[in-house]
């Protein structure tokens, strides 16, 4: 017979299998927006935001979307990985993958697992390993901050490029509207003997 800890952990694993991790989401997205975006794949039970502790607020964030069953979760993952899926007007599509147990804040303790710790003395054989791990953690932190900086620069560059493109297209459409409303296009059509001018 299973212990209460094992039953709780099994329920948690079932919840993990029903959950999708969505990344590259704009910080302006809210829970109702995300729910309505993913309700087209099935019923959304819960939306949990994963805060970004490592960088500024402008960075894209992640969210855990719990669906009603595993089939809906697989539908979300397959559709979002094959086709671009935009949420809340973000200029780039979001990414989706299956959630993992360590992504949850309320993860229960694994049954039968105990955490042990001890102080290591400098003459201990594991002391050198611990120092190397500590150095490696610092190196990873520096690499991570560098990558976050580069990611922000790329996002800003992409945003400027898209803004310039939008302004250019808007000017073109304004010029076309002006030509049509002023009658210049009709005069040119008459001049070049084009019949059946579609506008006006």
Curated annotation (Swiss-Prot):
Quaternary structure and interacting proteins, as annotated: Component of the ASI1-AIPP1-EDM2 (AAE) RNA regulatory complex composed of at least AIPP1/EDM3, ASI1 and EDM2 and may contain CPL2, AIPP2 and AIPP3/BDT1. Binds directly to ASI1 and EDM2 and may function as a bridge protein between them. Co-associates with EDM2 to histone H3 lysine 9 dimethylation (H3K9me2)-marked chromatin and transcripts at a critical proximal polyadenylation site of RPP7 to hamper proximal transcript polyadeylation/termination.
Disruption phenotype: Hyper-dimethylation of histone H3 lysine 9 (H3K9me2) in several genes. Impeded use of distal polyadenylation sites at intronic heterochromatin (HC)-containing genes (e.g. histone demethylase gene IBM1) resulting in a lack of functional full-length transcripts. Silencing of transgenes such as 35S-SUC2 and genome-wide CHG hypermethylation at gene body regions, leading to reduced transcription of several genes (e.g. IBM1). Abolished expression of At4g16870, a transposable element (TE) of Copia-like retrotransposon origin, associated with methylated status.
PANTHER family: RNA-BINDING (RRM/RBD/RNP MOTIFS) FAMILY PROTEIN, RNA-BINDING (RRM_RBD_RNP MOTIFS) FAMILY PROTEIN
GO molecular function, one term: RNA binding
Entry-linked Gene3D superfamilies: 3.30.70.330
Keyword Hydrolase among record annotations: no
This protein's GO CC annotations: nucleus; protein-containing complex
GO terms under biological process: chromatin organization; defense response; epigenetic regulation of gene expression; positive regulation of defense response to oomycetes; regulation of post-transcriptional gene silencing; RNA processing
Function: Prevents gene silencing by suppressing CHG methylation as well as histone H3 lysine 9 dimethylation (H3K9me2) status at target loci. Collaboratively with ASI1 and EDM2, the AAE complex regulates alternative RNA processing (e.g. alternative splicing) and epigenetic silencing (e.g. H3K9me2) of intronic heterochromatin-containing genes as well as genic heterochromatin-containing genes by promoting distal 3' polyadenylation, thus being required for the accumulation of their full-length transcripts. May also modulate transposable elements (TE) expression.
UniProt name for this protein: ASI1-immunoprecipitated protein 1
Domain (RRM) ranges: 18-101
Domain of life: Eukaryota
Source organism of the structure: Arabidopsis thaliana
Claim: RNA-binding is one of the keywords in the record: yes
Keyword annotations: Nucleus, Plant defense, RNA-binding
SUPFAM superfamilies: RNA-binding domain, RBD
Record-linked InterPro entries: Epigenetic_reg_gene_expr, Nucleotide-bd_a/b_plait_sf, RBD_domain_sf
């Amino acid at each position: 017979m299973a212990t209460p800890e094992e039953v709780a952990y099994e329920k948690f694993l079932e919840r993990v299998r029903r959950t999708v991790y969505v990344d590259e989401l704009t910080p302006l997205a809210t829970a109702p927006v995300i729910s309505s975006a993913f309700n087209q794949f099935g019923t959304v039970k819960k939306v949990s935001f994963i805060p970004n502790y490592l960088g500024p607020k402008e960075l894209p964030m992640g969210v855990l979307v719990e669906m009603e069953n595993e089939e809906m979760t697989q539908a979300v993952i397959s559709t979002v990985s094959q086709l671009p899926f935009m949420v809340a007007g973000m200029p780039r599509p979001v990414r989706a993958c299956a959630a993992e147990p360590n992504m949850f804040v309320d993860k229960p303790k694994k049954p039968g697992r105990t955490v042990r710790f001890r102080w290591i003395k400098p003459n201990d054989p594991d002391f050198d390993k611990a120092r190397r791990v500590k150095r490696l953690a610092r190196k990873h932190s520096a690499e991570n901050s560098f990558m976050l900086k580069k990611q922000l620069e790329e996002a800003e560059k992409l945003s400027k490029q898209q803004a310039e493109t939008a302004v250019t297209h808007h000017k073109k459409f304004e010029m076309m509207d002006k030509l049509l409303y002023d009658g210049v296009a009709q005069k040119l059509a008459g001049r070049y003997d084009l019949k059946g001018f579609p506008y006006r």
